[in-house]
């Protein structure tokens, strides 16, 4: 939520208690009849049914949106099952639909891994572009020993930063502007995408940031084979033309 003032946020869930604890003012409980507000029980079919049940409300939520970002974790019931349905409905309303999803840690079990794989296949067919963040790729030395809840929070922060980067490209005027049409030309029908982020400080901050982004553990694909790329560079007032 932090730093996302330029976009409207909507939290969806099949679990009423979990939704109640979500720090987002706009919320929607889906699958009220199907799940009775008790969650999807790690069953993607239940999550899919919940989204279909809320079809009218979801279409209304997508009304007049130019671009819709869908975020969630694959592997469970609600996210895995509902995201492909919501992506399809968003596209029906003409919105550019970008899904940013996390894949489960390998130690979360074979069932969640299998669910995530099947859910990703469906999502690829529904969304314009799917940005995949494998949680296992986040297991760097500096977070390996974190408590599990903090490790999940770290994954959520990466996901949030990815959204903020893309919204900044079109919603905040820069020295080199990229408008919505530019983004659509790259992301419309873009398939699966990866994201890399880097920061730099000191005398070599520009090159350090580029190297960090290009060697990000989140980049599993060879970028030389990419059909397109969105690049967002942010710096202070002292950033030079050479940088």
Task: Kindly give the residue locations of the regions a language model identified.
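Tubulin/FtsZ superfamily GTPase core signature
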Residues: 1-243
